């Protein structure tokens, strides 16, 4: 019984991830993400328009969300892997 209880406690701690860590995508692939450093608690997706039909997309972690402009669309969010 004690072994079962101990196992449940360990599984709970691992699943809850007691340390605060935001996880943000850094590629278009949903399985590839990075754990954000302390202080960067938002995910960002920036779409930069280079030519009429060519775009660069940057994904990652950020502390303060910048504003969008005519050539840059910015999406910030504050849940794990929300910057798809």
From Swiss-Prot:
Predominant location: secreted
Protein name (Swiss-Prot/TrEMBL): Beta-cardiotoxin CTX15
Pfam families: Toxin_cobra-type
Organism per entry: Ophiophagus hannah (King cobra)
UniProt GO MF annotations: toxin activity
Stretch forming the signal peptide: 1-21
UniProt keyword Transcription, yes or no: no
GO CC annotation terms, alphabetical: extracellular region
Alphabetical UniProt keywords: Cardiotoxin, Disulfide bond, G-protein coupled receptor impairing toxin, Secreted, Signal, Toxin
Tissue: Expressed by the venom gland.
InterPro entries: Cytotoxin_Cobra, Snake_3FTx, Snake_toxin-like_sf, Snake_toxin_con_site, Toxin_cobra-type
Subcellular location: Secreted
Function: Acts as a beta-blocker by binding to beta-1 and beta-2 adrenergic receptors (ADRB1 and ADRB2). It dose-dependently decreases the heart rate (bradycardia), whereas conventional cardiotoxins increases it. At 100 mg/kg, intraperitoneal injection into mice provokes labored breathing, impaired locomotion, lack of response to external stimuli, and death (after 30 minutes).
Highest taxon of the lineage: Eukaryota
Disulfide links within the chain: 24-43, 36-61, 65-76, 77-82
Similarity remark: Belongs to the three-finger toxin family. Short-chain subfamily. Aminergic toxin sub-subfamily.
Anything else known: Negative results: does not affect blood coagulation and does not show significant hemolytic activity.
PROSITE patterns: SNAKE_TOXIN
């Amino acid at each position: 019984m004690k072994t079962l209880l101990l196992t449940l406690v360990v599984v709970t701690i691992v699943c809850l991830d007691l340390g605060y860590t935001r996880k943000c995508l850094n590629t278009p692939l949903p399985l590839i993400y990075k754990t954000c450093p302390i202080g960067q608690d938002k995910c960002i997706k920036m779409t930069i328009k280079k030519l009429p039909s060519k775009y660069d997309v940057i994904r990652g972690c950020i502390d303060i969300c910048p504003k969008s402009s005519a050539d840059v669309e910015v999406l910030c969010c504050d849940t794990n892997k929300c910057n798809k």
